[in-house]
């Protein structure tokens, strides 16, 4: 499994670099930059023909926007109606008239999806934390229930993006265990246990620098066989 940026790839005239998160009409400081969102979508979902991209905690819509703008089917969900309205505004600003967004609970995805939904090839997650998290469930329980809910409807791959402490060295290969930076909200062992308990198999992780006090880790997992 290799990892990198695809430049000049996608529909003609499309440029994720020109759609910086801070330029969207509906913006939150925690929003992912489009290049990272596009990379996560491609890694989780593979070739366009594989099926739809599921973004069950869509927030401002970053993953879903990049999926749609690259020619994929996508479903963006959020429990917060304000986020759904903002995500729709952002997708229209990006140049699409599609409406792939729906109000729904990430911990009960099956109840939100319609029976005629396209086959889902992968799921992308950038979980909220603290004041950015909705509802009374703490962020650990929220992530655990969301991973289990996603596994019920996805028999493919998962990309989970987590904030981390910064690394002094940038790597262009998967992180070895001794190279993993401390995560901001979890222990690495907790993440691996969560994945295992919810039907996912940890494969690899990569580090992406954000600024001198923050990094992000891209965790890649595949669906484990279910009994």
Give a label for each model feature.
Residues 1-227:
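Class I S-adenosyl-L-methionine-dependent methyltransferase catalytic core
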């Amino acid at each position: 499994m290799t990892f990198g940026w695809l430049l000049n790839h996608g529909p003609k005239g499309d440029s994720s670099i020109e759609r910086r998160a801070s330029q969207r009409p509906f913006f939150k400081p925690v929003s992912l930059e489009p290049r990272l969102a596009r990379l996560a979508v491609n890694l989780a979902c593979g070739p366009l023909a594989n099926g739809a991209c599921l973004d069950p905690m869509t927030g401002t819509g970053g993953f879903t926007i990049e999926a749609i703008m690259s020619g994929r089917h996508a479903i963006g969900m959020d429990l917060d109606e304000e986020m759904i309205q903002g995500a729709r505004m952002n997708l229209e600003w990006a140049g699409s008239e599609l409406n792939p967004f729906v109000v729904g609970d990430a911990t009960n995805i099956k109840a939100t999806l319609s029976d005629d939904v396209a086959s889902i090839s992968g799921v992308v997650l950038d979980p909220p934390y603290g004041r950015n998290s909705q509802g009374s469930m703490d962020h650990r329980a929220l992530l655990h229930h969301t991973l289990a809910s996603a596994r019920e409807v996805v028999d493919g791959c998962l990309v989970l993006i987590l904030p981390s402490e910064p690394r002094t060295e940038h790597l262009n290969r998967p992180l070895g265990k001794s190279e993993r930076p401390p995560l901001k909200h979890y222990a690495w062992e907790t993440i691996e246990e969560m994945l295992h308990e919810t039907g996912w198999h940890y494969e690899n992780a990569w580090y992406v620098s954000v600024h001198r006090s923050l990094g992000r880790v891209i965790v890649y997992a595949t669906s484990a066989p279910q009994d």
